[in-house]
Amino acid sequence: MTRSPGADPEPATGALAGAPLRSADRVYARVKAMAVFYRLRPSERINEVELARRLGVSRTPLREALNRLAAEGFLEATVNRGYSVLPLDPKRVLTLYEYRATLEIGALRLAAERADEGGLDQLDALARRTQHSTGQDALAQLAADEAFHTHLVALADNAEMLRSLRSLNERMRFIRWIDLDKGQPGHWTDEHATMVALLRARDAGAGAALMQAHITRRLDRITEMIRAGFAEIYTGNALAARILGDAA
């Protein structure tokens, strides 16, 4: 059975399922997961009364969570209309991938200057992990891929870049899972090994060009999939139900 995304996915599942939520942070985590996995229908106004009832909480922590998620870009806030989940459409996906490319290319250039051999050895081990993950399910591939790219950005030794990537990973996780779950394994894992070699050679130019091509290929594939349409992307799918622990 295919597992659905939510990494760091496995620990989150138990925390999201089960008894009514009691803290503002848990309400925030639950609603964020519902938004990311499209358990809330995109572009439709969120019914706060119904959602509070469903979660077993009052309107106060729920409104706090909605405000926070809107500020972080997970929800859209509209005057006199409330909150809604951003739709999964090609334009939004393009925006996210453009941001990711700009961020990771910049980080790679800094890493070529700043990374030490120990850090590159760790990155090499993570590149091998992504190669081994291709025989596993999409969730394992996604976890390995995220670990590689996160460590690469960490090698830039720039805390703001790393913080931005982690936030971006959360917003893109379901999109990237669709790519891995529906697509065929490609040569993207070999490109990770090449990136490590280019970083060891301190060849920032070639590394940046490879990163741009690497991300653009993934963008092209996921955009094509979204245009084709997948019913399970949106509310009511069993994949979201499994990760959130509620009925489809």
Give residue ranges: language-model regions.
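Conserved amphipathic alpha-helical segments that form helical-bundle/coiled-coil interaction surfaces
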Residues: E113, E117-I178, H187-A197, A201, ...
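Membrane-interface catalytic loops of GT-C/OST-like multi-pass glycosylation enzymes that act
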Residues: D181
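Short linear motifs at protein or domain termini
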Residues: M1-E113, T223-A248
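Mobile beta-alpha loop/short-helix "lid" or hinge segments that flank ligand
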Residues: A71, L75-E76, L168, Q184-G186
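Conserved acidic
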Residues: A19, S23, R92-T95, Y99, ...
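Poly-acidic low-complexity segments
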Residues: N47, D137, Q184-H187, E191, ...
